[in-house]
Swiss-Prot record:
GO cellular component: cytoplasm
Native source organism of the sequence: Shewanella oneidensis (strain ATCC 700550 / JCM 31522 / CIP 106686 / LMG 19005 / NCIMB 14063 / MR-1)
Keyword Hydrolase: no
Gene that produces this protein: coaE
Protein name: Dephospho-CoA kinase
EC number assigned by the record: 2.7.1.24
Residue ranges occupied by any DPCK domain in the UniProt entry: 5-201
Function, in words: Catalyzes the phosphorylation of the 3'-hydroxyl group of dephosphocoenzyme A to form coenzyme A.
PROSITE patterns according to UniProt: DPCK
InterPro entries: Depp_CoAkinase, P-loop_NTPase
Places the protein is found: Cytoplasm
GO biological process, one term: coenzyme A biosynthetic process
Length: 205
């Protein structure tokens, strides 16, 4: 991969989107795994057609789009079906993300991936950046934002890579316990560092 890529990750409610948007304000292109995951199953795509032929048309909404909630429910307790779905979608998502990286026009690219380490996508990046907050804050922020109960959020946290493992595997860490002004300063400092690293990377490419 010719572009210098930073993999941005963090647990649910950690503030990944806020941090990603601050990098975008610095003029950096974002490749977001969640956005790509929706694009590969948009109406008319091979991804959606494969899901319909496997699970049936009941997986569609009235407007012909994928009913994500219904699909999630369908595969949640069925390991075999979940594996089938992952084997279909993960390579598509990965390929589309790499295409978007190559098309990016900024000096480096931020790849926003919630499950960067869990899905082995850290192998696609040159540097990893973890947005870190305490589990207590993760729960309170997500409950407020998504209007879900704390038990649900806790289950999601427990299904993801542990906080200590994420921090141990991170090249860079942003502590998101403070004010937005502090966050902006941290992002700006990292941006300068990544410009330097991408310059060295591009010079030796």
């Amino acid at each position: 991969m010719s572009k210098f890529v930073v993999g941005l990750t963090g647990g649910i409610g950690s503030g990944k989107t806020t941090v990603a948007n601050l990098f975008a304000e610095e003029g950096i292109c974002l490749v977001d795994a969640d956005v790509v995951a929706r694009e590969v199953v948009a109406p008319g795509t091979h991804g959606l057609n494969a899901i319909i032929s496997h699970f049936g048309t009941e997986m569609l909404t009235a407007s012909g789009e994928l009913d994500r909630a219904k699909l999630r429910q369908r595969v949640f307790n069925d390991e075999q079906e979940r594996q089938w779905l992952n084997q279909l979608l993960h390579p598509m998502i990965r390929q589309e993300m790499l295409l978007q990286v190559e098309k990016a026009t900024s000096d480096y690219v931020i790849m926003v991936v919630p499950l960067l380490f869990e899905n082995g996508l850290d192998r696609l990046v040159h540097r990893t950046l973890v947005v870190d907050i305490s589990p207590e804050l993760q729960i309170s922020r997500t409950v407020q934002r998504d209007n879900v109960d704390a038990t649900q959020v806790n289950n999601i946290i427990n299904s993801q890579c542990s906080r200590s493992e994420k921090l141990a595997r991170a090249d860079d860490i942003i502590d998101n316990h403070g004010e937005i002004s502090r966050l902006k300063r941290e992002v700006h400092a990292l941006h300068q560092r990544y410009l330097q690293l991408s310059g060295n990377h591009n010079a030796h490419d």
